[in-house]
């Protein structure tokens, strides 16, 4: 938790989910301050993209902005920080990056995302609604503003310039001039080796151009012939859950992720590759397994992320492991794949009281932990 002076006001801001071990990490950055210095002379509809923890939304709540984000956790963080500062949550309208944008905004503020493909998707969506009078300003750490970033703005929207660096942050100013632009596919797609399946990925999905090596290893060691419910936790494009659906014909599969684009990709991949099995599926945008009833799943399959935005962290994995233990039936099993150096074995042993190594190679390990009743 930290205090930030933004737009002439003092705000208390916190990263989300709150985590005592990461109190030193701020929920705002110089790029937020730099952006806010540019907006006081612009009135009208305001769109905010990729506001990680809601610093911009809190500072601009009086404008009733629209906050556009692929991350459900970022929405939860923004709502949390609005409440902490006594601001009505209804003052900000939330929508995901796949929903149509409001027309003719006066002001567009963009925090440049880590994934260039997501930025391209968002700029293409903006191209359909902005006007030459729309003030378009993006911001990032100076080290994250590359020639390729500027070229994308120039190609999709029009005339693009950059600011001087300030507190190691830089601004991108863009004027819409409607340059000629070829159409782009809505998703990236590739063939999954050893199957008849074509995998489709929206822009912000990890490994959108091919199967990542951790998932490839995990696919070789998934459980078969289970009954009940299986969860693909942190499903990404859903390739793990898709294989689980095929290998467990008497089970239901939940695909869940905090990314709207990930869950949309998972749904699309079931619809395109196993359409007859869609009735056995559930798709949920969620913060891990929050709100899921206890003792529900027979098995949970998980490849935990170890980044939150630009920060390296293990609290997401911890949350997933603890949520999995609560949500599994007694005797239910959590299967995890991860880089060897992350030491998930010790974490699972602590959370579950047991852990077994299923398989290992020179980079990854696959582990299994079982929910058992505590001995009295």
Curated annotation (Swiss-Prot):
Name the reaction it catalyses.
guanosine(1835) in 23S rRNA + S-adenosyl-L-methionine = N(2)-methylguanosine(1835) in 23S rRNA + S-adenosyl-L-homocysteine + H(+)
The GO cellular component terms are: cytoplasm
Sorted UniProt keywords: Cytoplasm, Methyltransferase, rRNA processing, S-adenosyl-L-methionine, Transferase
**Cysteine-cysteine disulfides:** none
> Where found?
Cytoplasm
| Pfam families reported for this sequence | MTS (PF05175)
Q: Does the keyword Cytoplasm apply?
A: yes
Q: Does Glycoprotein appear among the keywords?
A: no
**Principal location listed in the UniProt entry:** cytoplasm
Q: So what EC number does this one have?
A: 2.1.1.174
* EC main group: transferase
Q: Which GO terms describe its molecular function?
A: 23S rRNA (guanine(1835)-N(2))-methyltransferase activity; nucleic acid binding
- Check the record and name the InterPro entries matching this protein: DNA_methylase_N6_adenine_CS (IPR002052), rRNA_m2G-MeTrfase_RlmG (IPR017237), RsmC/RlmG (IPR046977), SAM-dependent_MTases_sf (IPR029063), Small_mtfrase_dom (IPR007848)
Query: Per its database record, what is this protein's job?
Result: Specifically methylates the guanine in position 1835 (m2G1835) of 23S rRNA.
HAMAP family found in the cross-reference section: 23SrRNA_methyltr_G (MF_01859)
Family membership noted in the UniProt record: Belongs to the methyltransferase superfamily. RlmG family.
Name this protein carries in UniProt: Ribosomal RNA large subunit methyltransferase G
């Amino acid at each position: 938790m930290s205090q930030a002076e933004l737009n002439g006001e003092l705000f208390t801001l916190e990263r989300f989910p709150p985590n005592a071990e990461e109190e030193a990490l701020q929920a705002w950055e110089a790029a937020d301050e730099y952006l806010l210095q540019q907006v006081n002379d612009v009135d009208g509809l305001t769109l905010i993209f990729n506001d990680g923890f809601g610093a911009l939304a809190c500072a601009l709540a009086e404008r009733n902005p629209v906050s556009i984000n692929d991350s459900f956790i970022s929405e939860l963080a923004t709502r949390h920080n609005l409440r902490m500062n006594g601001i009505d949550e209804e003052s900000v309208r939330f929508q995901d990056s796949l929903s149509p944008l409001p027309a003719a905004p006066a002001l567009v503020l963009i925090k440049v995302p880590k994934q260039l493909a997501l930025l391209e998707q968002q700029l293409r969506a903006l191209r359909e609604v902005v006007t030459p009078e729309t003030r378009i300003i993006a911001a990032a750490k100076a080290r994250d503003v590359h020639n390729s970033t500027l070229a994308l703005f120039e190609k999709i929207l029009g005339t693009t310039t950059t600011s001087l660096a300030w507190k190691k942050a830089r601004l991108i100013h863009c004027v819409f001039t409607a340059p000629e632009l070829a159409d782009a596919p809505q998703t990236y797609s590739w063939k999954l080796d050893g199957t008849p399946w074509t995998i489709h990925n929206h822009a912000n999905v990890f490994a959108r151009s091919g199967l990542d090596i951790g998932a490839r290893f995990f696919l070789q060691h998934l459980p078969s012939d289970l009954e009940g419910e299986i969860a693909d936790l942190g499903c990404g494009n859903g390739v793990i859950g898709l294989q689980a659906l095929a290998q467990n014909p008497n089970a239901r599969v939940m695909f869940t992720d905090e990314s709207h684009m990930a869950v949309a990709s998972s749904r699309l991949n079931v619809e395109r590759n196993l359409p007859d099995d869609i009735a056995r599926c559930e798709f949920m945008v969620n913060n891990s397994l929050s709100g899921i009833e206890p003792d529900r799943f027979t098995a949970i399959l998980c490849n935990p992320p170890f980044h939150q935005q630009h920060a390296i962290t293990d609290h997401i994995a911890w949350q997933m492991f603890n949520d999995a233990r609560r949500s599994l039936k007694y005797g239910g099993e959590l299967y995890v794949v991860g880089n060897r150096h992350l030491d998930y074995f010790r974490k699972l042993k602590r959370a579950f009281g047991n852990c077994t190594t299923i398989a290992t190679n020179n980079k990854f390990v696959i582990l299994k932990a079982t929910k058992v009743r505590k001995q009295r």
